[in-house]
Design a protein with these regions (language model features):
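Positively charged n-region of N-terminal signal peptides that target proteins for export
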Residues: 1-6
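Bacterial N-terminal signal peptides
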Residues: 7-17
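Noncatalytic, solvent-exposed loop/strand surfaces
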Residues: 20-452
């Protein structure tokens, strides 16, 4: 396969002045089906720097937002140092060893010494050429955790517009030709130990939904996709939160499900509280998703003893918290108090629920009952960490480590490691899957990978 290599750097100067059918979109973080893509014979099983790479794009700056896809458009964000010199990245092994020794703290902060430029890119899906790039904001922000980025929120699209949320700046909307349609400013808010932000927006109908939980004033809100005007807003008692909300279309109604340090809260599309429960870990990153008519929620901060997974039935009302010692009730179909993962969201593929722990452990349970199918299995060797969420297609489970190695496993009731695909680059972003291709973001490149 021919590799096309393109650089985005050449356009930075110009920017400063301004299921069965083919799956053609991946419109938000983890797509619409919790990381599961429709089977396609050209979706890749194996790849490497010179194998099955359709194109590779150099991405200036830093950003851990995931790419999204709409037809022939691939969107992603980055933050570029205006000096042209990026802050050196510490060796990945340093972060990994510290993560194993204990959670990182507020001492692990970096503060920019020069203004940064927040950038939205539109990359041509077929060729990898940069269709356009827009500078959204230029400023010198406050400190953040060294391992996070100032562009960690994944954009969202409805096929007509692309929406970008920047936790330090606000909401933006562009049409697919790169014209800015609106901007709704938001003030930066203090996050736990200065770790920065990551919760992404989601689109449903003519509204954009957002959760902004911080140490100051937390809230959930809906915005008009055409104008950016606020439709409703609800103040929340949650502390800092990095989880993306989920639109749950079930057999009873459509809900906006939010998770956080205080618990789970679900609202109707007009912001009215529906149901909730306590019992989450103190820091929450993973995003809810649905499969088999159930809502799956996992929460697993590594320093907490409570690291639960829940499977929720539709139709709940009010407080559905579990009594101490109980694992189910009328609406909690099953739960497990120690199964949750910290950074990666869980995956349900076929009849099985897969938990990928940050330390490279995969655990499989029956998705409908919670019964263990197989216990902890070591995916990786050598202590590498996993931040990106797993994904699945063609009867296989994929998990990409922070080292850029993707581990390919057979889906089903028995664990089998089929192979490893190395890109040899630091990787924290969850890939997108569309048009028979895997779109992978690393610390400095964007890849389109396919066996076409």
């Amino acid at each position: 396969m021919t590799l096309t290599r393109i650089t985005l750097a050449c356009i930075l100067v110009a920017m400063t002045t301004c299921g069965a059918a083919a799956q053609t979109s991946w419109p938000q973080f983890r797509g619409l089906h919790g990381g599961v893509a429709a089977n396609n014979p050209v979706l890749p099983d194996t790849w490497g720097p010179d194998e099955n790479i359709v194109w590779r794009v150099d991405v200036p700056g830093r950003g851990w937002s995931s790419p999204i896809v709409s037809g022939n458009h691939v969107f992603l964000t980055s933050v570029v140092n205006t000096t042209g010199v990026e802050t050196p990245i510490k060796p990945l092994s340093q972060y990994q060893s510290r993560s194993f020794d204990g959670p990182m703290t507020g001492a692990d902060l970096e503060t920019p010494s020069a203004p940064l430029r927040w950038v939205l890119y539109d990359v041509d899906f077929e060729t990898g050429a940069v269709r356009w790039a827009r500078t959204l904001h230029t400023a010198t922000p406050g400190a953040k955790h060294e391992k996070n980025s100032y562009a960690s929120e994944t954009p969202a699209t409805d096929g007509e517009r692309v929406y970008v949320y920047l936790g330090y700046v606000g909401l933006f909307a562009f049409d697919l030709d790169g014209t800015q349609l609106w901007h709704t400013p938001m003030d930066a808010r203090e996050m736990r130990q200065g770790w920065g932000t990551a919760s992404s927006p989601v689109v449903h109908g003519d509204r954009l939904y957002l959760v902004n939980d911080s140490l100051e004033q937390s809230f959930a809100a809906a915005y008009d996709t055409a104008t950016g005007s606020e439709v409703w807003r609800i103040d929340r008692a949650e502390a800092s939160n990095w989880s993306t909300p989920f639109i749950w279309e079930n057999n009873v109604r459509t809900e906006v499900v939010t998770t956080g340090s205080g618990g789970v809260r679900s609202y109707d599309l007009d912001g009215r509280y529906l149901w909730g429960f306590e019992g989450m870990s103190s820091i929450h990153v993973a995003t809810p998703f649905t499969r088999h008519g159930l809502l799956y929620i996992n929460s697993g901060y590594t320093a907490d003893s409570n690291r639960p997974v829940y499977a929720i039935r539709s139709g709940a009302a009010g407080d559905i918290s579990l009594p101490i010692g109980s694992t189910s009730n009328d609406y909690v179909v099953w739960s497990n108090p120690t199964l949750g993962s910290y950074n990666p969201s869980a995956l349900v593929y076929g009849d099985y629920h897969y938990t990928l722990l940050d330390r490279g452990i995969l655990i499989c349970h029956d998705a409908k009952t919670g019964a263990e199918v197989y216990p902890r299995q070591r995916v990786s060797r050598g202590g590498t960490l996993f931040t990106a969420s797993p994904w699945a297609y063609n009867g296989k489970i994929f998990a990409i480590s922070e080292d850029g190695d993707t581990y390919v496993m057979k889906a089903g009731p028995e664990f089998e490691l089929l192979g490893t695909n190395a890109l040899n680059e630091w990787t924290l972003a969850t890939p997108a899957i569309a048009n028979g291709s895997l779109i992978v973001r690393t610390v400095s490149n964007l890849y389109r990978i396919s066996e076409e």
